[in-house]
């Protein structure tokens, strides 16, 4: 049976006022934009198991100097996670690490979390993903983005909780730069700026681009320590000496230390602070301040003497707690009026 339907003549149909139609259309568009933005605020790409593993992790710290990724370092870091869930975090970029880590490690899952804004870093789901990870690796990129986007957010707190819980963590390049208590933040660098050079810093330790910060993360073994990467490859010794001088001159520490790692090198640190150096790069440089800088003032060349250095090549061992090593070479460096002088034969800095 057909049910008759009465349709009002066109002349009797009510039309929405033009202003109301405009408001409804605008509201619809804004809702769609907001929904799209919420979906794109962060990206999470995962391979492997859909359910999180209940793996017990061992404390470990994988500090990588950038350049070619080292299978040995990643396998060591994965081993600390005992088959749990491996999470890569970054502000921009791709999920290329997923396939790489999944190929060389036996993990329940490997995922990449890309968090490009503070709004995204304050999403509860982002913090939840981090809290469920067994192992976290901070990828390379631009450390100023990590600081601007993540510090003081739900994500930042979740990262620190991961460290406090004793779970394994690692980082390379910019990801290494934010592991120490003291951080060179690149906060004043523009997109196309070249690297801040050793010459620039030694000529003026208060160069506006020397932006130092504290406690992005609170890794217990890295208290009072500055971390840097691409070290010998990019000739960063002079700028590191300038950074350490600034830390003293600004009253942050009387005797700061630095762990500086060259490209294709890594430092694998156990829970008790004992570490080994791996990789074909020039290794790891452990710096320690022994006396305050004589001259560390705005617009003046740096004078800073007797900074102790321990160069640790692949195979060397170093105890971060006692600050002693074996298998490496100790020497000292001084800066006088912006020029480096080394105690090594031939005056070699690296």
Question: Where would I find each of the regions flagged by the language model?
Answer:
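C-terminal and late-domain segments of enzyme folds
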Residues: 39-83, 189-350
